[in-house]
């Protein structure tokens, strides 16, 4: 796949194809970062540890930022999975704005650099419950920073134990929430491409009991159906 690296509006369809073409899905029993068990996950490491694809993802995020009209001082990747992406985005942002600051969030407490009195957009890879984002917000407040928004590369579109969506969790903390892709829609694409056998598709559907029956196995779904968006 030829990657479009020029600035402009976010190309949603291209981003979905990028995820599928780079084989980022991992199928099989796993424990997610949230602690939940699942029969699949999205593994962003291959895309974020190669400079060409890292640059593409960073520019995709900035295209979305441009569409949304956001003007933060800092982009910070939620540690540790998207730390490199946060840095890549900040470097591109500096080229556009002239801002010369860089802050990296440590895994537990503290930062490399000083985020105080700066507006922050947090970047996350795949969100499930939003727990890591809430912890980052609490840390930012302790350091007198101003978190304003969260952008996830992919949203699993599942509910927390309290029955809330990640959007509701983030917005309850006073931040805007945006995602570049919906995992159920990606799974529809993966199933259409023959990447998911039918027995596994049934298990995946069972993980999404809150969605309409047959959302994955149904034969009439268009590839990018925006099922839950």
Question: What are these model-predicted stretches?
Answer:
Residues 1-229:
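PRPP-associated nucleotide enzymes
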């Amino acid at each position: 796949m030829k990657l479009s690296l020029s600035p402009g509006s976010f190309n949603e369809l291209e981003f979905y194809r990028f995820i599928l073409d780079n084989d980022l899905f991992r199928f099989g029993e796993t424990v997610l970062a949230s602690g939940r068990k699942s029969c699949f996950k999205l593994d962003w490491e291959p895309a974020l540890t190669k400079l060409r694809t890292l640059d593409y993802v960073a520019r995709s995020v900035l295209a979305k930022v441009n569409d949304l009209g956001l003007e933060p001082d800092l982009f910070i990747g939620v540690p540790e999975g998207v730390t490199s992406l946060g840095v890549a985005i900040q470097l591109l942002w500096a080229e556009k704005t002239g801002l010369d600051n860089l802050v990296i969030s440590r895994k537990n407490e503290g930062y490399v650099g000083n985020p105080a009195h700066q507006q922050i957009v947090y970047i996350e890879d795949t969100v499930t419950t939003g727990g890591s984002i809430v912890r980052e917000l609490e840390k930012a407040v302790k350091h007198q920073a101003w978190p304003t928004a969260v952008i996830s590369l992919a949203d699993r579109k599942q509910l927390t134990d309290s029955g809330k969506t990640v959007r509701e969790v983030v917005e309850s903390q006073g931040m805007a929430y945006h995602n570049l892709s919906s995992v159920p829609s990606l799974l529809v694409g993966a199933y259409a491409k023959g990447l998911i056998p039918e027995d596994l598709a049934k298990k995946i559907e069972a993980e999404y009991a809150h969605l309409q029956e047959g959302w994955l196995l149904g034969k009439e779904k268009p590839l990018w159906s925006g099922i839950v968006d």
